[in-house]
From Swiss-Prot:
Pfam families: Ribosomal_L28
Keywords per UniProt: Ribonucleoprotein, Ribosomal protein
Family assignment from sequence similarity: Belongs to the bacterial ribosomal protein bL28 family.
Biased composition range(s): Polar residues: 1-22
Gene that encodes it: rpmB
Coiled-coil stretches: none
Transmembrane segments annotated in the record for this chain: none
Gene3D superfamilies linked: Ribosomal protein L28/L24 (2.30.170.40)
UniProt-annotated stretches for the region Disordered: 1-25
Protein known as: Large ribosomal subunit protein bL28
Length: 78
């Protein structure tokens, strides 16, 4: 399963680990993803989403119906 938030589209980023001796090695910064079920009252069903913590906050603020409408407008199957 890909490490991409379905709401925000956040993907892994890249950067460096930097040691005390200032040695640098490449690393990935992964988004804080969670598999979460949301109850959609209008459709009378559960929807499973893979969302980041920021995506959860967006759903709390705007509501699951508005977020699902935006996702469907982007062509994402939900």
């Amino acid at each position: 399963m890909s490490k991409v938030c379905q709401v925000t589209g956040t993907r892994p980023g890249t950067g460096n680990n930097v040691s005390h001796a200032n040695n640098k090695t490449r690393r990935r910064f992964l988004p804080n993803l969670h598999d979460h079920r949301y109850w959609v009252e209008s459709e009378n069903r559960w929807v499973r989403l893979r969302v980041s913590a920021k995506g959860m906050r967006i759903i709390d603020k705007r509501g699951i119906d508005a977020v699902l409408a935006d996702m469907r407008a982007r062509g994402e199957r939900v």
